[in-house]
């Protein structure tokens, strides 16, 4: 049963951009130059669930994830996390809450510093948030390396990201996200750059870590196969709006919105 109190609640969340125009374009054009990447989204995410956010590239999924984390400040609406409105927090208060909200990005190579060893990269969030003395960080990092399947841990600790495969890099990124013991993990296309066989291994790892660490996932993907395999509920996003929301099997077997139907028709093997 779903608990009554959501871990994350979005209320009329907006992320709008204005395109810069030159003087003459402004003078002779009455067109609205606002891009509504996230346009009035209401969404609730409950403890222990995996909510999939699906849609085509460019529909606003990644912008939504960055707005939830306040990597981008919302232009309107509210983000409530643990019943606290993040839009009202000061920068230090927000930094404190970020320990509880972590992100796994699409490209692990881009988010890992090539000059830092694997061990130092994973330890970095521990030290930033002052969760343990530097002398204790190495033991915590090696424990996390073991949890994500990078063994022997002492060897991987001293390697650099460029010495690892894509799947191993993503395991490091997962370890880095989980080292602060967050409650919410936002996964932005975390397996889309991996080979199919490695995808399945990383998804299985993420599922077991979810149970072990009592995690809640917001799982962003354009891959409907992955969403159906991994998610409890599905939110379908199109042009900055959530157009359909429901339990995974219900959305796949009985889609209500024309956009959802079109998405599924483009991947016919998924239906039924």
Regions found by a protein language model. Give the residues of each.
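ABC ATPase NBD coupling module
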Residues: 28-30, 86-102, 120, 128, ...
């Amino acid at each position: 049963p779903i608990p009554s109190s959501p871990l994350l609640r979005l209320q009329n969340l907006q992320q709008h951009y204005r395109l810069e125009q030159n003087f003459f374009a402004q003078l002779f054009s009455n067109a609205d130059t606002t891009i509504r990447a996230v346009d009035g989204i209401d969404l609730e995410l409950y403890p222990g669930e995996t909510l999939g956010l699906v849609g085509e590239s460019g529909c606003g999924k990644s912008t939504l994830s960055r707005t939830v984390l306040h990597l981008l400040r919302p232009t309107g609406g509210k983000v409530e996390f643990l019943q606290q409105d993040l839009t009202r927090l000061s920068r230090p208060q927000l930094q404190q809450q970020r320990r509880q909200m972590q992100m796994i990005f699409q490209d692990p190579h881009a988010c890992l510093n090539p000059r830092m060893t694997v061990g130092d990269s994973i330890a970095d969030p521990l030290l930033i948030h002052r969760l343990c003395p530097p002398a204790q960080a190495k033991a915590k990092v090696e424990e996390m390396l073991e949890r994500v399947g990078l063994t022997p841990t002492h060897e991987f600790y001293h390697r650099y990201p460029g010495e690892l495969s894509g799947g191993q890099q993503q395991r490091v990124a997962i370890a880095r996200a989980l080292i602060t013991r967050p409650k919410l993990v936002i996964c932005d296309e975390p397996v889309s750059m991996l080979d199919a066989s490695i995808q399945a291994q990383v998804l299985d790892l993420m599922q077991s870590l979810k149970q072990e660490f009592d995690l809640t996932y917001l799982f962003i993907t354009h891959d409907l196969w992955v969403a159906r395999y991994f998610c409890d509920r599905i939110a379908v996003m199109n042009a900055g709006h959530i157009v359909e929301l429901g339990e995974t099997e219900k959305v796949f077997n009985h889609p209500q919105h024309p956009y959802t139907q079109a998405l599924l028709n483009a991947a016919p093997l998924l239906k039924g």
